[in-house]
Structures are given as C-alpha cells and as structure tokens.
Amino acid sequence: MNTEKPSVAHNVDHNEIAKFEAVASRWWDLEGEFKPLHRINPLRLGYITERSGGLFGKKVLDVGCGGGILAESMAREGATVTGLDMGFEPLQVAKLHALESGIEVEYVQETVEEHAAKHAQQYDVVTCMEMLEHVPDPQSVVHACAQLVKPGGEVFFSTLNRNGKSWLMAVVGAEYILRMVPKGTHDVKKFIKPAELLSWVDETVLKEQHITGLHYNPITNTFKLGPGVDVNYMLHTRAKKA
C-alpha cells in the first residue's frame, strides 16, 4: 500500500477542484448551489470579527476562498485580504465580482503550503473555512496556516465532524433530501473529528481558544452558532507570541 503523503506543492484533489469548477459561474447566485454559503457567511464573519477584535487594518488570508464570499465580506470590514484557491474558474469569478463590487481583494492560485514557503508570519488573521475536508492531507494545511500567521495572530478553521449524525445531516439531508448542495459535494470519509483537528493544531504554534457548532434548523430554515460540534463546527486558534 502506498503510504506516501502528497507533496506540499500538490496537496490537491483534482476531483474536488473539478466539482467546484463546474458550478463556479453560479457562485454569487443567492438561490443557487452556494446558497448555504451565502446564508452562513454572516455567522462566519461575525464569529471571525468578534474573536479577532475586529478586522479593520489587518492583513488577512482566506485559504480555499472559492468565489470570494467570505474574502469580500472581510475586505468590507476594512481588512487587506488575500484569497487563496487552486480552482481557476472560482478565482476568475471572484476577481470579476470584486471588480464589479468595487472591493479590493488579491486572489492567488496556489496551495497554502506553497504560499507559506514565501509568506511565513505575514498575516494577522488566517481563515480556512469548509476546505480541510476537500484536500488529501488536511494536517499539512493546518501546519501551513500556522506558519503563515504572525505571532499572536488568529487562525480559524471550519469543517464537518465525522459520525453518523453528520452523514445523515450533511450528506443524506443536505444533498439528497433538502437538496441544499449538489449531490457528491461531501465525502463522509474526509470529514474531520474535532479531536483530530485539535491534535494537528497542537503540533504547531497554535493554541485552541474557542470551538462552536454551526447548526441548521430545517423547520425554521435558519442557521445559528452554539454548543454542540457533532456536525458543522468552527475552531478559533491563536499563535503563540514571540
């Protein structure tokens, strides 16, 4: 059995990239495939902003930025934002939308490992939202994010827990019953238990600050943050000061 990890320059699942490339043109359609991302973005932004003590004047990196939903919203808060993604089409959509919106965001097509090799300790805040479950080596991504943040800076991760409930909610429910996201968006085998993510964090300069769940109520069709990390969750970490 081949146990070699992908090289840092190729920590990419091309099937995952292809899935998002295929629907990239509809990234900013509020009623399209990315409607859930638009719906949860105010919650993500609020969490990041509050726990970072505000984003104004800060240098921010959004890892796995896709079409730029979170990146643009952080730029609107006054941050200097760089968006990183390996999908060409999503980045083209992001660049065009930023231009049309009058928002300045720098978008770069490269892996986070490649970016870390050139920009170590250059960011006040690093975000990595709904990206870890789409790469072959999420541990490598966590390590790279830790390298990119300044001492004392903030790093945020969000992903999906791996258990029966998350499979029912995120795959069966969201993809096949409610059709909130396209079928095949998620692979439960790639979901990440909080203990696994925290073990990778502990290998770096990062320290856990707070963890919260992201919950969907199908009856009220609303999202909220709160206790319980059995499906979607967000983790706030902080780099040790020099």
Curated annotation (Swiss-Prot):
InterPro entries: SAM-dependent_MTases_sf (IPR029063), UbiG_MeTrfase (IPR010233). Signal peptide: none annotated. The keyword Signal does not apply. Its EC number is 2.1.1.222, 2.1.1.64. GO terms for biological process: methylation. It comes from the Bacteria. Keywords: Methyltransferase, S-adenosyl-L-methionine, Transferase, Ubiquinone biosynthesis. GO terms for molecular function: 2-polyprenyl-6-hydroxyphenol methylase activity; 3-demethylubiquinol 3-O-methyltransferase activity; methyltransferase activity; polyprenyldihydroxybenzoate methyltransferase activity. It is an enzyme of class 2 (transferase). O-methyltransferase that catalyzes the 2 O-methylation steps in the ubiquinone biosynthetic pathway. Belongs to the methyltransferase superfamily. UbiG/COQ3 family. This is Ubiquinone biosynthesis O-methyltransferase. The lineage of its organism: Bacteria, Pseudomonadati, Pseudomonadota, Gammaproteobacteria, Enterobacterales.
